[in-house]
């Protein structure tokens, strides 16, 4: 017997190849033929007693090859196991006939690779710049304006008054693409705050200056990142302005603070400071997560992976389900999506596979770093996280513990610890 082996890392599989030739294979063919003859029933003869001239009519080469394969597959597999295997299998290999004739048989034993990871350098990576987070006055004003909106008064404008940013407008609209009305592009008595960016870019700005009673056409372009059926297309909207109300916000003073009734905040200056701190915390959290994702991408580049096919297929299935759910939410069929985007099923499958493999690699790298650095959530940290949720939702900690699984909290705490570790040990 002759042994060979090959690894297909991109497919998550390997194979052992065993070749049986010449006299050795001839012996297996004889055994197969004799076994078949023993159980062969030929009309006019007792079972297994027909002469060679008669059995030859029934025992075709294909039948003999198949029977010989059944006999040889176990010794061939045992032979493969006895060799110096540099490729370890993660499941029971599947035997496949590659080639068969009177002279030889070639059998492949195909199997999933064992999951392996050799993680690259994960400290002192300087190819990604550490973010600098700043909070400006506009950031603070935007949050405070949201607070002010809670207590805003609305005053109806006069007939000749024009729409301005911040106004509340009631109107009818109907949209057209290529002079054809499109689904979801029409509404009656729609209420919109101008400047809320609720509509596509340019829509609300085009309404500024219009008056009650005006029937006006406006032109916009849908963003490239939009519902596929409308993405990047020019559109026309016919508007009928019915009512305009001015939103009158309360002053930025201590009276606003009283109305908000926030804990430990009694003056407007304290409110501004608290908002600034909250915005800084939020921005820092977002930029930190983005930085860590970029660092993990860098670690992946220098790491070596061997991922079993079954794991890849399982992740592809999950990613595909997410993709299909997104299309369903947008009420678009897969065929329609392909028609709009001009991409093939093969391209979609390749993209989903690439996404799936990247997710697996990111998870493996994160898990390996966590193990190497012994990042484990302490009981104190877990309890502190429960307290954090309790304060957030205004529920007692014991009640929160009955609602949220302890393992889920442990996982979240460890994820945060890992993120902090990667953040503190990388960047410039």
Curated annotation (Swiss-Prot):
Major place of residence: cytoplasm
Q: What class of enzyme is it?
A: isomerase
Localization annotation: Cytoplasm
Annotated SUPFAM superfamilies: FKBP-like, Triger factor/SurA peptide-binding domain-like, Trigger factor ribosome-binding domain
Give this protein's Gene Ontology molecular function annotations.
peptidyl-prolyl cis-trans isomerase activity
* Entry EC no(s): 5.2.1.8
Q: Which GO terms describe its biological process?
A: cell division; protein folding; protein transport
Q: Can you give the residue ranges of the PPIase FKBP-type domain?
A: 166-250
The terms describing its cellular component in GO are:
cytoplasm
What is the reaction catalyzed?
[protein]-peptidylproline (omega=180) = [protein]-peptidylproline (omega=0)
The UniProt entry, under Gene3D superfamilies, shows:
3.10.50.40, Trigger factor ribosome-binding domain, Trigger factor, C-terminal domain
Q: Which family does it belong to?
A: Belongs to the FKBP-type PPIase family. Tig subfamily.
Chain's role: Involved in protein export. Acts as a chaperone by maintaining the newly synthesized protein in an open conformation. Functions as a peptidyl-prolyl cis-trans isomerase.
Which protein, by its recorded name, is this?
A: Trigger factor
Which organism is this entry from? Mycoplasma mycoides subsp. mycoides SC (strain CCUG 32753 / NCTC 10114 / PG1)
């Amino acid at each position: 017997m002759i042994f060979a082996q090959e690894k297909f890392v991109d497919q998550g599989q390997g194979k052992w190849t065993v070749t049986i030739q010449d006299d050795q294979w001839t012996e297996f063919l004889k055994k197969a033929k004799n076994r078949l003859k023993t159980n062969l029933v030929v009309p006019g003869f007792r079972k297994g007693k027909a002469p060679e001239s008669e059995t030859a009519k029934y025992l075709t080469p294909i039948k003999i090859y198949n029977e010989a394969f059944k006999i040889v597959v176990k010794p061939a597999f045992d032979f493969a196991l006895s060799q110096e295997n540099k490729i370890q299998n993660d499941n029971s290999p599947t035997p496949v006939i590659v080639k068969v004739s009177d002279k030889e048989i070639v059998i492949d034993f195909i199997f999933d690779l064992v999951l392996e990871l050799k993680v690259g350098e994960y400290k002192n990576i300087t190819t990604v710049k550490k973010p600098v987070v700043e909070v400006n006055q506009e950031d603070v004003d935007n949050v405070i304006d949201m607070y002010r909106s809670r207590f805003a008064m609305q005053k109806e404008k006069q007939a000749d008054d024009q729409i301005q940013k911040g106004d509340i407008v009631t109107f009818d609209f109907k949209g057209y693409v290529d002079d054809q009305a499109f689904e979801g592009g029409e509404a009656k008595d729609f209420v919109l705050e101008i400047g809320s960016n609720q509509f596509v870019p340019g829509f609300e700005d085009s309404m500024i200056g219009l008056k009650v009673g005006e029937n006006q056409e406006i032109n916009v372009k849908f963003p490239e990142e939009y519902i596929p059926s409308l993405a990047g297309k020019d559109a026309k909207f016919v508007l009928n302005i019915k009512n305009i109300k001015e939103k009158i916000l309360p002053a930025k003073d201590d009276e606003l603070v009283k109305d908000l009734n926030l804990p430990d905040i009694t003056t407007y200056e304290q409110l501004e400071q608290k908002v600034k701190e909250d915005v800084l915390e939020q921005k820092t959290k977002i930029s930190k997560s983005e930085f860590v994702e970029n660092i993990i991408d860098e670690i992946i580049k220098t790491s070596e992976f061997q991922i079993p096919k079954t794991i890849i297929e399982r992740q592809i299935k999950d990613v595909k389900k997410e993709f299909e759910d997104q299309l369903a939410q947008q009420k678009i069929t897969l065929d329609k999506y392909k028609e709009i985007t001009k991409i093939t099923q093969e391209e979609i499958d390749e993209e989903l596979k690439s996404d799936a493999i990247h997710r697996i690699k990111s998870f493996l790298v994160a898990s390996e770093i966590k193990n190497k650095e012994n990042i484990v959530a302490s009981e104190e940290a877990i309890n502190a996280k429960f307290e954090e949720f309790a304060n957030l939702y205004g529920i007692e900690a014991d009640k929160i513990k009955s609602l949220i699984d302890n393992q889920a909290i442990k996982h979240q705490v460890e994820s945060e610890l890992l993120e902090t570790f990667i953040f503190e040990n990388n960047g410039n």
